[in-house]
Amino acid sequence: MYQEEIVIYARTRCRQCRRARRILKRRGYAFEAVDVGGDEELSARLVETTGKKEVPLIFLGGRLVGGLADIEALERSGDLDRLVRGRV
């Protein structure tokens, strides 16, 4: 798996994934987008390490932040900026 500061594991045609990417872009965060569509090995490793089968999965500094609902909640509360600023 990638070790960029912010990494989003997603699928190209996933509506929730597009929403999560838009949030990160709107906040001005640089991130690495990794398409897991068709990569069964990577998908299996993500499930093994996170226990989650759905995407998007957003990592910050190699640690799982969560999925779309988590990013939306962090953005609403203002904690997303604090979390990212503490890492970047």
Residue spans for each PLM region:
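Loop/helix-junction capping segments adjacent to catalytic residues or to phosphate/diphosphate-binding pockets
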Residues: C14-C17, E40, V65, L74
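Thioredoxin-like thiol-disulfide oxidoreductase module
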Residues: D35-K53, D79-R87
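Local sequence-structure signature of Cys/Sec-based thiol-disulfide redox active-site neighborhoods
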Residues: M1-A30
